Structure formats: structure tokens, C-alpha cells
């Protein structure tokens, strides 16, 4: 039986990935800030979905992650789909800093916890949702672009570290783009 944790499963891509994995027979742990959305998704497959409310910007997020891993009895896949992005033409500092808190601090907190879990386990797969904005930058969303660049580079560096340490940890950075018709 394959097991995964999806952080950011309360909406969008994370929610859809959760649905797809359950359809494919996976047992999953889902996490996010909105408890009602977590329970609504859990109700679709209560025998295969467990939940844990967490906010990646809080220091306790890794404790919640480890609790979810324990409830599942271990995991094979860690999928991070938690993030924020806003247009900020006026460069309001609170918007920029909140984006950095979620997309850099929260991202780092969760991905390093997953990396260390898989290092101890001996194998695993870390998948993250990044953005094409991390390759070129978007003038209307400077913090979003910069944080996505950070994520791209961080995952590349972790993949190198895993190879250097001869770890069986695999990485997927899902850049969002529209393929040609």
C-alpha cells in the first residue's frame, strides 16, 4: 500500500492531487489551514484519508507533519502544494513579507522535515509545486517570483545533497506552465 502526505490539500492543485491519489488506491494524509475543507475531502474516502490541521508558517508545523506520518504508519511521497502569491504593484511590505514567510520559511520548514524523514527511512519522494515565475520573474509579483526561484534552487540543492550522501530520495519540482497546443 502506497502512502502520501499532501500539504496544502484544502484547495487547488493539492486538493486535486489528493483526489487522484485516492482514486489510484493510495492512503493519504492531508494537511492545511482550513479544517472544514480537510474534513470535506476526508468524507469522500474516510477509510483512506486522515487529516491534520497545520499552518506551514508556524513552528509547530513539523510536529503536526510527524504526527500525520505516525498516523499513516509512514509515507512514500511528500507533496507540498502550500503557497501564496499576490500581485503587488505598490510593493506593500506586508504582502511581500507574508509571501516570503509562506513560500520560503514555510517551504523550508516542511521540505527539510520531509528530507530528514526520508533520510532516516532510507528512501522517499519529495514533490513540490513551484512556478515558471521562478525562472523569469513577474514584475507585478516580485516576492512571489523571488520565492519561487528560491524553491527551484532549494530543491536542486537537496537533490544534489541526496546524491552526495548516496540517499534514495527523489525530487519532483512541478513548474506550472501551459504546454503548446
Features from the language model and the residues they span:
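Short alpha-helical oligomerization interface
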Residues: 89-101
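Residue(s) in the substrate-gating loop at a strand-loop-helix junction
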Residues: 131
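Rossmann-fold cofactor-recognition segment
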Residues: 45-60
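Conserved small/polar residues in nucleotide/adenosyl-binding loops
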Residues: 177-181
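Active-site helix of classical SDR
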Residues: 111, 147
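Conserved glycine-rich cofactor-binding loop
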Residues: 10-11
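Conserved NAD(P)H cofactor-binding loop of Rossmann-fold oxidoreductase domains
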Residues: 81-86
Amino acid at each position: 500500500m502506497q502512502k502520501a502526505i499532501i500539504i496544502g490539500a484544502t484547495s487547488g492543485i493539492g486538493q486535486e492531487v489528493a483526489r487522484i491519489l485516492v482514486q489510484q488506491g493510495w492512503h493519504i494524509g492531508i494537511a492545511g489551514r482550513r479544517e472544514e475543507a480537510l474534513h470535506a475531502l476526508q468524507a469522500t474516502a474516510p477509510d483512506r484519508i486522515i487529516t491534520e490541521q497545520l499552518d506551514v508558517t508556524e513552528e509547530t508545523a513539523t510536529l503536526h507533519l510527524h504526527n500525520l506520518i505516525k498516523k499513516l504508519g509512514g509515507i512514500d511521497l511528500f507533496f507540498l502544494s502550500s503557497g501564496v502569491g499576490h500581485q503587488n504593484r505598490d510593493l506593500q511590505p506586508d504582502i511581500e513579507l507574508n509571501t516570503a514567510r509562506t513560500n520560503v520559511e514555510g517551504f523550508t520548514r516542511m521540505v527539510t522535515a520531509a528530507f530528514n524523514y526520508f533520510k532516516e527511512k532510507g528512501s522517499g519522494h519529495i514533490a513540490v509545486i513551484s512556478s515558471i515565475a521562478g525562472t523569469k520573474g513577474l514584475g507585478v509579483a516580485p516576492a512571489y517570483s523571488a520565492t519561487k526561484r528560491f524553491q527551484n534552487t532549494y530543491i536542486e540543492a537537496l537533490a544534489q545533497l541526496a546524491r552526495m550522501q548516496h540517499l534514495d530520495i527523489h525530487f519532483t519540482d512541478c513548474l506550472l506552465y501551459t504546454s503548446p497546443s
